[in-house]
Amino acid sequence: MTGRFAPTPSGRMHIGNVYAMLGAWLSARKSGDSIRLRIEDIDEPRVVPGAAETMMRDLEWLGLGWDDEPVFQSSRHALYQEALELLSKLSFDEISDIISTGSNDSKPCSTTAGNEAATSEATPLIYPCFCSRADIRAASAPQEGDRFTVYPGTCRRLIASEPQRAKQRLANNDRHSMRIATADTTITFHDEVFGTQQYNLAHDIGDIIVRRSDGIYSYQLAVTVDDLDMGITDIVRGRDLLRSNALQIYIRKALINAGFKPSEPTQPFHPADGSNKPDDVTISYAHLPLIDNAAGQRLAKRERSLDLGILTAHGATAQQIIGYCAWLLGLQGDLKHTKPQPMSADEALGVFSWDAVRTNTSDRTLDQGEFNAYSDCRPYSAVLFCSFILQLYSAIAFSQSIIPNQADIR
């Protein structure tokens, strides 16, 4: 199996990033497997110059090494365009039939089909969307917790009922994004932390953007293409991406059946027919609990969590940071009855198991008393350390920026 780090270089890494990256590193190394580094810099306006290089130095300092050369999304535009063109050749009916019959894999997930709308025959798998954000906000109710807004299907109906009107708008160069039509199908998969998960694509997710109106490929398309192309089979990230996982399984199946050829194909564990199709493999998914503030909300990036540069400037060591993240993962015992202890990444590897992580699947909540107790072993003041703790959790799933932003899901 192959794991991956997938940070976004929009600034210096926070402890929240390290928490998720440690989980990914431990999962891969515990099985003796490789782990790749992918810099998710496709949304170039958000990239901070030099952040990727600093991020790599920080990972090495923490003892979280990776295998092979880093991969940069910014150098893979041609690959994403190729993937989009392949998907565009499929009709909605074709992929709906494929998804409803399941796959040849060794059961990382399964699908259950529902009843499709009467207009599905006229719907391409990839279609243009002319809706503005305001249009979608007015017609949709946001889903709780993970920022998904289910698209109401306005342009999908337009293309089915008035195809000439849609073609004319394209001919007029009207600003538009590109969406993928989702089937009335339930995706079921096993998560190492949260167990069996089920999401209906049409009702829980909807038709999501795969290329934005500014020409930038969406997170959902890029990460699915990358994981498939790089042979990633061990995916660890925050639980706010559970719903995205179902969507990415759908896109992955569509890509495979459209003829996408990975540059680093995975080898099947137990191929039924001797084939090397990329859907013959088992993929391991693990989504980590999030960390909330005292109000039960994730801290926003605008609250300026302290980064590793500030922490190291005030004396924090790699062992202290790794130890704290290992404690958050549940690797040092019950969070309610233990306090964190410094440890190296290799020491954390010695005690890592998913059983320990899944012992407590609740989101972690800031507790001032626990943090004050931990400050007793810090080489800098308790006041400074408490300030550090209160701000360090603005990012959890490899940074907030990998969570599908509103431009990606509308």
Language-model features, listed with the residues they occupy:
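Active-site cores that bind ATP or allylic diphosphates and position pyrophosphate for catalysis
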Residues: 102-123, 133-264, 269-300, 307-312, ...
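Exposed alpha-helical structural elements
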Residues: 79, 135, 150, 320, ...
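Short, functional N-terminal and low-complexity linear motifs
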Residues: 20-27, 48-54, 212-219, 287-294, ...
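Short, solvent-exposed secondary-structure boundary motifs
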Residues: 17, 199-200, 408
